[in-house]
Amino acid sequence: MTNEPRYPLLALARLRMGIDGAGITTLVAGAGCPLHCRWCINRRLLKEGAPEQITAAQLLERVRIDDLYFRASGGGVTFGGGEPLLHAEFLRQFRSLAPDGWKIRLETSLAVPPDQVIVAAEAADEFIVDCKDMSPEIYRRYTGGDRDLMVSNLRRLLDLAGAERILVRVPLIPDYNTEKDQESSAASLKSLGITRFDLFPYSRRDL
């Protein structure tokens, strides 16, 4: 199929525990991101292209080696950044091919067009949202992006998926925000209806 959606695959990381959601997971790391975070964890993700453009069926064949681990542990496949929601049609196709019992998780900034959120909401069991900071000024200074787009998409995702399927990560970023900013972000997110949080200190490793 010439128009079959493909994913810009950088790497697969197997047998991960407690990092990308519950259970044993495989992280699918892709290229491409709409943000330009000042301290990007993996700067390769800002480059155009990727080592391989892979179809959903091809990816399934590579990750199904851990099928028993996924089923036994309540784990599955986590798509991470880059920004997986840039490839929402691919995600929907992968979901349709994946065996029952696999959990599909998406790590996302939500800095994408709204229609991508609508499609992705049908493709995932859980969303891990990296909101950076709820202050528009801090968000723009750190990411170069528009916080209002993220918030609008978060509201949309809450309506489509429900709070129980959303975990929001709020990092403490040296030189950009403070613990007080973290607490303020958490309070703002609670007012939106978010119930699951991960407040953590940012690591400068791999920079």
List the predicted regions and their residue ranges:
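Conserved AdoMet/S-adenosylmethionine-binding subsite of the radical SAM
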Residues: 64-68, 73-76, 80-81, 85-206
